[in-house]
A protein has these predicted regions:
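Alpha/beta-hydrolase active-site loop
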Residues: 99-120
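Short beta-strand element of the alpha/beta-hydrolase
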Residues: 48-58
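Catalytic histidine-centered segment of alpha/beta-hydrolase-like enzymes
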Residues: 298-309
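The serine-hydrolase catalytic nucleophile loop
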Residues: 60-72, 86, 278
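Conserved alpha/beta-hydrolase
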Residues: 73-93
Length: 324
C-alpha cells in the first residue's frame, strides 16, 4: 500500500543520534487498516538476518521520545528495531485523533510483527517486543495473543485498564465510583457529539502544583522540560480526548497474561508509584522463562531515559537468550 502519511525527515528526537546506527522512517498497516508511522534502526554496516524488536510507549508519548531511545540503543547492540507511534497518535494515522484502545493498541504491536516478519533482513522466528509504561500492558496482551512474539520486555509498566477502572492504588475500586465515572464520560460524549468535536483532557499539568504527588512532578520534569518535551506528544501538549477512558473502563487487559508461553522480562523501579502493576502482573505469569527485575531506588520516569539506570545489558542478554 502507498503511504498516505506525512512524515518528518529531520532528526527531531529528544535524544542524540548514534552514528553507529542506520535510521529511516517506515510505515505499515494494522489489521484495522490504520497506517502506522515508525522509525527503523539497525546496526550500521551489519548484515542480516537480524533478531528484531518492536518498541512503543509510554502512554501518551511518541516515538521521538523514550521508545526511540530504547530502539536506537538496542540497534547499537545488534538488533533491528522499530519504534512506532500507536494508532491515533503522533505521525500515525487513525481518526478521531488522541484516543486509546486496548484492542487496537495491542494490535499495533502485532502489526509491527507483521512488518518485521516479511523483511529480508529479519529472521521471522526471532522477533520480540518492548513496551514502556502503558504500552507495557499492551505488550503483555500482545504476547498473550500473538504466538509469533518470542520475547517480551516491559519497563515501568502500567495496566491502563486497571488504573482507569480502579483509580491509582485501587482507591476507587467500587461500583459507585465507576458508575460516577461512566456518567461523567457519557455526558461528555453527548457534548462532543453535539459540538462536532472532541474535548481534550490536557497533558501533564503545567505549572505543577507544589503539593502535587511526586510522580506528577516526575512526569512534568520529563514531558514539560527540554529533557523530554516533544510537540507531537500528547503528554507534552493537549492530552488525550476526555472520553478516551471509555475504551479502557470495562476491559481487562491482562486477563490472559497467565497463558503467555513465551519469555517475559518485567523491569520496574522499586520506588516507582506504579511498581504495584508489575508486581501484581508478574504473579500471573507462568513458567521459568519469566523474570521480574526491580531497580533499587528508581522511580517511574527514571526508566524513560536514564541511561545510567535502564538495565540495557540485562535487556540485551534477555533478547539474545530467547531470540536465537
Amino acid at each position: 500500500m502507498n503511504s498516505t502519511l506525512t512524515l518528518t525527515q529531520e532528526w527531531d528526537k529528544t535524544f542524540p543520534q548514534n552514528d553507529a546506527v542506520d535510521h529511516c522512517k517506515v510505515t505499515f498497516h494494522n489489521r484495522f487498516g490504520i497506517e502506522l508511522a515508525a522509525d527503523l534502526y539497525k546496526p550500521k554496516g551489519a548484515q542480516g538476518p537480524f533478531a528484531a524488536v518492536a518498541v512503543s510507549g509510554p502512554f501518551g508519548a511518541v516515538k521521538e521520545q523514550c521508545s526511540g531511545l530504547y530502539a536506537q540503543e538496542l540497534a547499537a547492540r545488534g538488533f533491528l528495531t522499530v519504534a512506532f507511534d500507536p494508532s491515533y497518535t503522533g505521525e500515525s494515522g487513525g481518526t478521531p485523533r488522541y484516543v486509546a484502545s486496548p484492542d487496537i493498541n495491542t494490535e499495533d504491536f502485532s502489526a509491527a510483527v507483521d512488518f518485521l516478519s516479511v523483511r529480508d533482513d529479519v529472521d521471522p522466528e526471532r522477533i520480540g517486543i518492548l513496551g514502556i509504561c502503558g504500552w507495557g500492558g499492551m505488550a503483555l496482551n500482545a504476547a498473550a495473543i500473538d504466538t509469533r512474539i518470542k520475547a517480551t520486555v516491559t519497563t515501568t509498566m502500567y495496566d491502563m485498564t486497571r488504573v482507569t477502572a480502579n483509580g491509582y492504588f485501587d482507591t476507587d475500586d467500587n461500583p459507585d465510583a465507576r458508575y460516577a465515572l461512566r456518567q461523567t464520560l457519557n455526558a461528555q460524549r453527548t457534548a462532543d457529539y453535539k459540538a462536532g468535536t472532541y474535548q481534550r483532557a490536557g497533558g501533564v499539568v503545567d505549572p505543577v502544583p507544589a503539593d502535587a504527588p511526586f510522580f506528577v512532578k516526575d512526569y512534568h520534569d520529563y514531558y514539560k522540560t527540554p529533557r523530554g518535551y516533544h510537540p507531537r506528544s500528547l503528554n507534552s501538549t493537549g492530552g488525550w480526548n476526555v472520553t478516551s477512558p471509555l475504551s479502557l473502563l470495562n476491559a481487562k487487559l491482562l486477563a490472559y497474561a497467565g497463558e503467555i508461553r513465551s519469555a517475559v522480562l518485567m523491569i520496574h523501579g522499586d520506588k516507582a508509584h506504579s511498581c504495584y502493576f508489575s508486581r501484581d502482573a508478574f504473579t500471573r505469569l507462568q513458567g521459568d522463562n519469566k523474570e521480574l527485575l526491580l531497580i533499587p531506588g528508581a522511580v517511574h520516569t527514571d526508566l524513560y531515559d536514564r541511561m545510567d539506570i535502564i538495565p540495557f545489558d540485562r535487556i540485551e542478554a534477555f533478547y539474545h537468550q530467547y531470540l536465537k
